[in-house]
Amino acid sequence: MTIEFETPKPIAQIQFVLKTVAQEMMRSQSRYFDENEHDIPFSYIEFMHTAMKSTGGGSLTPKDDKPKEGAEKRPPIGYQTLAAQIEMLAWGDVGFYLITPGGGLGAAAVQAAGSPEQRAKFLARFAGEKPTFAAMCMTEAGAGSDTSAIRTRAVLDEATQEWVINGEKIFVTGGDKSFTEYEQFGKGFIVVWASIDPTAGRAGMRAFVVESGTKGVSIVKLEHKLGIRASDTAVISLVDVRVPYDNILGSATVEKTTTGFKGAMATFDATRPLVAASGIGVARAALESLKEKLTEQEVEIRYGLPRNKLTSIERDVIDMEIQLRSAWLLVLKAVWMADNKKSNALESSMSKVRAGDIVTKITQKAVEIMGPLGYSREFLFEKWFRDAKITDIYEGTGQINRLVVARHILGYSGKELR
């Protein structure tokens, strides 16, 4: 199989439509929701839900590429399409992209670790009448990237055949919209990672679907953040939370193999290139706006000249373009592998590392070149700079992903290389 570098026609058509949405509905409201962090853009959410339903989908999730009987067989492009959608929406506003209705990380966890019956049960709601959200609850105070240190516990009540969960989760992206029962939204859920056997380490870790409105769950607070302010980030407390036995994703039997941990990692292998795509969208927004401002000032970027003949600004802009394109190619490889059912743990982490680096560098350089105007709220350059950093932090920090890359390349285990 070969990777095609030309954008498939179905993807190009989607990008054309989304660019209008990104420009007119997202970019135009960026500043307001940046300065009013916990307001909810209900009109955008409702519009996107209606639009996605009209195209046969209910959320930003990869569509089934299986051809209908008798139809021409085409290469799978589900994750490639999703990456292109996310990049364009993040180009509009990455905070808005993060509140686009759908399953998000919560649905990705069900997709990666759930049974066919669980996927049918929990994922169908995203194509319902109302916008619906799901979130993943993994991070804890003192247990961020070290998943083996998770202290949230799930104990089986033999009498009722229910799991009883206790713990607290922090930095839950979309936690409020996924769990709080808003009249405008459908019934969402959160996926809580907890240990069913503390002595087993990562092997005892499992994910549980907790439906919105479940007793014992409370939103403790919403974070005030540096960037992505249109998206809510919650602290969630779980006190004697009871969920049905069948809401555990995967087997309830603890074995020596780290089955639960592998379920979490499978989720990230699928989503890290998509996080990278969102960062690339932010970087492209900053770079394109910078070039527009330079053009207004009659500053020409002369491509094709030897480097020593270029001005400092020309070198900077060309370097920014190189960084952007190289990062996008890594994303394309990772999502192509996901579409073709190839193991992409290495490529997934590589794309995340590269995007986390370049989006920070490109947005910072754009602010520098713009000078005081880049630092001013008159333009969005300073906002893109603030929005950029999260790409390197969530869904595996740059440091963690560098470890993943090194282990794969050198052939070391997690114990051998920390």
Regions found by a protein language model. Name each.
Residues E162, N166-S218:
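A short core secondary-structure module
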Residues W91-V94, A143, I170-K177, I228, ...:
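Glycine-rich phosphate/pyrophosphate-binding beta-alpha loops
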Residues E129-M138, W193:
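A short, Trp-centered hydrophobic/proline-enriched beta-strand micro-motif
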